[in-house]
Amino acid sequence: RIVEQVERSTLLLHIPADALRQETLYATGGSALMANYDFRRYDVQAQGGKYRHSQTLTAELGANFHQWIVRSGQSYTTFDGEARFSHLYRYAQRSFSGRDAVLQVGEIVTGDALFPGITLTGVQMLPEHAASDRLSLTVSLPRAGSAEVWQGKILLKSYQVSAGINRLGGLPALSQQDDFTLVTFDESGNRQQQNIPRLQAQPESALPESGSAFAAGRLRLSRERAPLMLASTGLLQTQRIALRAGGLAGEGYLAAAWQARLRLAGKLTASLSQIVAQTGGKKLGATHQAALSYPLDQQLSLTTSASWRSRGYRTIDSGWRADGEESGDAQIRSQLAAGVSLNRAALGLFSLTASDTQSWRGNHTRGYTLAWSRTFARVNLNLGVQKNRLTVARQQHEDRYAYLNFSLPLGRDSNLRGWMTRNNGAMRMGAGYDQTVSPAFAWSLSSEQSAQQAPLLASSASWSSKYSQLSGGVARSATGSRFSFGARGGAVVHSEGVTFTPHSVGDTFSIISLHRAQPDVEIRTPAGTVWSDRHGYAIASLTPWRKNSVQINPHSLPGNVQIPGGIAELTPFRGAAVPLDLPAWRVRRALLTFPPEERPEPGSAVENSRGALVAYVSEDGTLFIDDLPAGPLYAHRPGGARCAIALTTPWVDRPGSLYTLLSARCVI
């Protein structure tokens, strides 16, 4: 039923509640090939003539079709001519929205709540919200630059990082035993290395509390490639408690597990779990885990966890490293971890993570990372402290690292910064100047000195185009020179050609078409700003199952081009390569002037030959038309006589011009 409210210029629609659509319509469809890349090269030329160089490349190849996701990840590294290629993963994935489940086939990592993190070649079915097997690390860095995360001898992923607290996400971890190695390069070319305990990595998706999970296949990193099968399911789910149980069976290995998650008070939750395993039909062992979580609000969260293992307990993949070599350090005795995050306007941003791991062989790893950031007036301060101690065979190896830096804005697009770092007793300090020339280009100049090294002068620049993100730097001192270069981005092959993007392509994305060869149109997407290529296409990575907004920046359009609306919202199905049309139209805006004796009446309506309204004559007797039609136009002269508008100046197309000034007559 429709009710018209004339006085309010409103129509009221009365619709029965049962006629409203309850199910969300997800954007689906599309097929495409994709690729992501991140390339880095570093060169060092010593004063005496010695030359060293290294290169790293991480790449992801894949395809999206009918909501299937196919991905393959690999990394390639060289150091002074010695090369290493590492295969990280290869899998296919499909979500089933009606069942809230996802199927993965190939080289996968189990996402089961009771037996997570097992790398295998096989198949698994698990709840949709637990589909991501990636990890994230929170690190604190003194200067902007690039970072590499390694596990064993394998490069997992590269990042562009800023000074202060950084979250390094999307890590495809290969082992539950190996710690991570973080290698950073600042804009001066300085290389620093830190060891980060594996325990400090956080999963990017929540492990399932309800629903069922199943996995079967063969271990991927052990030499025997032993077969295994595991399953778990939720037994009880209430507002106060969630109970889950499951089991795992492999060649010479059996395990049973349970887990309980309890809501103690408000947002304070606890979890208890136990796994009992039998190895070789004889050895029996158990592990016990307990955790507390208190996410008070978006500004404060507390977490702590602890686990203890009996001497006879083994995981099914114990004893094997990420690079396939046998490890003797897998007999973990206990693991403790704690973290606190605080964000208050008066105190700033504070983060602390700590971990402690002991093995039955007497090995001991202990570490913590503290970071603090606060803005005083216009000055931003960052403080970071990190310490890691490794004890093996009664021999200790300790890494200590601390830094303090500041940043002072000098205007809208420039700032002055300074820093001081101390790494295992070596002190360095320096200052720099940053200038952002445009949203796509920035450069910096810095100087650094230390007691151990000669003063260093460095410069770097970064450029983000519609095709790729490029960066480079050069540094020089009395002892030699350093050079660096980087390129990162993605590409999508679709039915209309190849489209490059400066951002990595996610598992769900949209292929934006402007329906004409209109380059350099700025488009704001959930993953960042992109620009249309010379064919009028761009790629936008999307978040599945959520509403995503894609918006044209109208200021980036030429004056004679418009995109009606200029904004689109869509909720995509995971794995969709959604075609998104935002058609751009070239318009003929014109300002018509008339001689006094042949001028239409001010306020007169201007119509086409079909009688449709086109515009109104202005009070000064001029006529502005947003899109000048090709056919005849008619108006009225003073006195009411109908007249035809005839151009005395021919139309000339001027690309980029907002409008064209024309002379005309209104002829009776």
Language-model-derived ranges and their functions:
Residues 253-257:
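Feature captures the catalytic cores and cofactor-binding loops of soluble hydro-lyases/lyases
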Residues 2-163, 173-174, 185-221, 230, ...:
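Flexible, glycine-rich linker and terminal segments associated
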Residues 168-174, 179:
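Extracytoplasmic assembly/pore-lining segments of large envelope/extracellular complexes
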Residues 224-226:
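Short, solvent-exposed loop/turn segments at conserved positions within beta-propeller repeat blades
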